[in-house]
């Protein structure tokens, strides 16, 4: 089915804050107090540089940005999910032979997490767009599919490309987003691959996480503002995804899983086919996303202050009609119900579409036992 997409997303960059506090050993780590402080050499346990030049600071798990959130005072860090949704295996698609892409492994010591040193980004630059309906007049476009339901998580395999982005602070994303809330006041969480030149001074596909809460109306990425509690000591959020797909050539994908812990209520994020837990968004920071989502989007989005002057490529930079291996895809799409079970989105409440059909498109949704899938993309650089 197709209809205009109505998924809300508001994007702009915030600032980086950190806190200091105590730590205790065990599965849960309790944070007793918090106060904002600038990052300093004193809280860096180890510095690690990857082969492609990224620099990660290993900091104590209790000195991460999330715990400076005023609603997380006294928060006890949950080191792993209490349980996992059933039917986690993603099957191979008959018309897509894709290899799993990876993030660099960061060998931070036990009890620490890696934070990407982001000295090249202009963190003061901000941009946003209208979260409802057609968004081109506010600097955003999208193509993909959306389902509307009571949603407690999702799992998707995302085809990874490096689309050309012309504006330095514009971005092109391929990701999954979950939202809830009244019109004009949505909250959301998500993750996926983004090419964003101004983020780290390059045009690489990088793994980013996103969330927005209505109390501050301030969308955030990665660790730029408090909210996401990271537990992984080896996965660097914001790191480069490699390899990436080539048009009519080798195809690579990442698997993103977001699931609500049935006991703690935390929104857990896992990366890869082995579903490695990265961390979680505590429900206490949300008003509308504290219990469930009402809609979920999978596909591509472009945003930025100069998007309408120089529309970036989306996906592979080619139309969905070019077919598998040429257009980008999202596949094995599943959602999670209240009983922590996977199910395939319904044909009656799942729709594909584009906010700018002369620039980007989304193909028909295919439903099978593996989940839903579709192709999407476009060259951008159009005026209609």
How would you describe each model-predicted region?
Residues 2-384:
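Exposed, interaction-prone regions of secreted/extracellular proteins
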């Amino acid at each position: 089915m197709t209809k205009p997409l109505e998924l809300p997303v508001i994007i702009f960059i915030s600032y980086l804050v950190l806190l200091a506090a105590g730590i205790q050993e065990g599965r849960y780590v309790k944070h007793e107090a918090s106060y904002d402080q600038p990052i300093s050499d004193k809280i860096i346990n180890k510095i690690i540089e990857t082969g492609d030049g990224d620099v990660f600071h290993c900091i104590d798990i209790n000195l991460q940005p999330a715990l400076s959130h005023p609603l997380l005072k006294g928060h006890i860090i949950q080191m792993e999910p209490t349980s996992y949704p059933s039917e986690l295996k993603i099957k191979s698609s008959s018309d897509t032979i894709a290899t799993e892409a990876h993030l660099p492994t960061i060998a931070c010591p036990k009890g620490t997490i890696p934070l990407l040193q982001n000295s090249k980004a202009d963190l003061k630059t901000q941009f946003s767009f209208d979260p409802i309906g057609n968004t081109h007049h506010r600097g955003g476009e999208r193509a993909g599919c959306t389902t509307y339901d009571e949603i407690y998580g999702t799992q998707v395999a995302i085809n990874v490309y490096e689309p050309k982005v012309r504006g330095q602070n514009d971005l092109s994303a391929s990701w999954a987003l979950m939202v809830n809330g009244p019109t004009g006041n949505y909250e959301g969480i998500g993750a996926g691959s983004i090419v964003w030149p101004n983020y780290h001074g390059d045009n690489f596909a990088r793994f980013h996480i996103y969330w927005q809460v209505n109390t501050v109306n301030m969308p955030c990425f990665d660790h730029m503002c408090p909210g996401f509690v990271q537990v992984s000591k080896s996965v660097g959020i914001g790191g480069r995804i490699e390899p990436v797909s080539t048009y009519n050539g080798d195809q690579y994908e990442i698997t993103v899983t977001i699931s609500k812990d049935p006991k703690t209520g935390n929104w857990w994020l896992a990366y890869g086919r082995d579903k490695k837990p990265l961390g979680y968004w505590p429900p206490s920071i949300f008003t509308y996303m504290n219990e469930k989502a009402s809609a979920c989007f999978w596909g591509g989005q472009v945003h930025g202050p100069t998007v309408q002057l120089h529309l970036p490529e989306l996906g592979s930079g080619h139309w969905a009609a070019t077919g598998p291996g040429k257009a980008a895809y999202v596949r094995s799409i599943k959602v999670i119900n209240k009983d922590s079970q996977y199910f395939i989105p319904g044909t009656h409440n799942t729709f594909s579409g584009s906010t700018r059909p002369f620039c980007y498109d989304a193909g028909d949704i295919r439903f099978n036992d593996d989940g839903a899938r579709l192709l999407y993309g476009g060259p951008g650089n159009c005026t209609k």
